[in-house]
Structures are given as structure tokens and as C-alpha cells.
Amino acid sequence: MPYFTTKDACKIFYTTYGVETSNPVVIFLNGTTQTTLYWGGLVPAFSKHFGLLCYDARAQGQSDLGDIPISLKLHVADLKDLLEYLAIDKAHLVGMSHGAWVALAFSAEFPEMVDHLVLCSLSAKTNDRSRAIVRSWLEILRLSGLEAMAWAALPTVFGNSFLNQHRKILDKIVDAVVLRNGRRSLIAQLEAVLRYPPPGNMTKNLNQPALVISGVDDPIIDPSDVRRLADLCNARHAELAGIGHSIPAEAPRIVEKLVLEFLSGSSEY
């Protein structure tokens, strides 16, 4: 399995599909509790048009936690070093939730390395409810462990339609979260997120074409704050009815169509 080792000896897991100098590259950035496997449903369609890079950020999935306290700045530095290691000079970034936060911060700091920017389930600020949700996950994780936290998170990370359609396999979804995450690493992730700067503060220097995608049935982010982020990024905004926070998992074919059309500038890509 491919790993990149950072300057502080933290191993970052990644996987690539057709990354060559002649191919434009799309980078998928995971949300909290997610791994590179999260993007599996999008790989077949996207790999026909782009080289792909999926990676587990520090403390996610198969990547190490490392010894340095996690911060948004550290995630940005890790991605910059990974791209230099892979000789990727410029790429399209597609981020989901936490991954969108990292993608936005990276785009603000290294605009010359970002072609197009796609932000799923991110808003201009974290309101009191979203902070309370993250804090509740953190406390449940500390007091009762990963399985309890995963069950508690389900109604906030998935919309009602998805929960209804997949009610017979919710236990398997929870099992997957437990299998792919470590308690100590996830605690570090959630503690760090509560310290991140508001996404809206990182939009001043953006000059890339941007697309913001949100779900109407998402309790974590406020619709008005999502629209504010889209305005700050001068971005197109797609709001999906009946979809919750985990947009690529809940509506993969819609995301596939929206993003491929956006990246290609065509309705036929």
C-alpha cells in the first residue's frame, strides 16, 4: 500500500488512478470518519476523464495520527508536501465537509496549485448547533466509544431519505465506521475541528472557479451560511432536495453529473 512520510515522520496513506503528466488530476478530500473508500462510487466515471488522487488525511483511516497537534494549517502543509512528492503541480480539489474545509484553506494559501474547487457540505461559519453536534460526538466518543458515537452521528450525517432506504444496513454502516477509525485519532480530529477558523475567513484570495453543493436535509450547516460561502467564493451553488450532509454517499450520480459538468465546462463532459 502506498504511503507518503511527512517531515515529522507521519505516514499518510494515498491511492492514485491514472495520475500522469498528461492527465488533469482530481483530488478527493475525505470528511470526518471517512476514508479513501468513501469515493469508490465516483472513481469509475471520474477516472475516464481525470487522474485521481484519494488520500486519508492525518488521523484518518490508514494514515497516522502523528505527534504534532492537528490543525487546519497542518493538513494544508501535508497536502502540499504530498503533491510535491507525487509531482502534481496543479489539480482540481473536491472536498466533502472536513475535506472541503481543507480544500478551501489549501486553495487560499496555494491558489496557483488549484484549478477548480468543489466544496460539499461546507458553510461560511460554524453556528452554535453545528459546534454542539461536533462537541456531542466528541463527548460520546470519550465516554462510550466509537460504536456509540457512530450511531449518534447517523441522523446528523445522513438525510431522512437515505436513512429510510438503507435502514436494514445501518448496523453495517456503523460497523464500517468503527473498523476504519481509531478512537484516539478521531478524538484528535474532533478537538481540532472545534478550533478551525471559519471557512468564510479564507475566501479573500480565491480566484478559482468554484462550485458549492449542499443538501436541503442537512442539520449540520445553515442554508443561509452556505449561500454566504457561495457568494464569498463567487461560486455556483447547487442545493439538493432530500439530501443530507453526506452528499457524495447519498447522491453519487447527481454529484458525478454536477462535478464532471463543472470541471469540463460542458453539459456532456
Predicted regions and their residues:
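Conserved HGGG/HGGXW glycine-rich cap/lid loop of the alpha/beta-hydrolase fold
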Residues: D8-I68
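Active-site loop/oxyanion-hole signature of alpha/beta-hydrolase fold enzymes
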Residues: G41-P44, L53-M96, K257
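Gly/Ala-rich beta-loop-alpha elbow adjacent to hydrolase catalytic centers
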Residues: G95, G99, A103
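Flexible "cap/lid" loop of the alpha/beta hydrolase fold
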Residues: L104, A108-E109, V114-S144
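Conserved alpha/beta-hydrolase catalytic His-Asp/Glu region
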Residues: D128-A132, E147-K204
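Short beta-strand/loop motif that positions the catalytic acidic residue
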Residues: L206, V212-S214, D218
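Conserved alpha/beta-hydrolase "acid-adjacent" motif
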Residues: P219-D225
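Catalytic histidine-centered segment of alpha/beta-hydrolase-like enzymes
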Residues: I243-E256
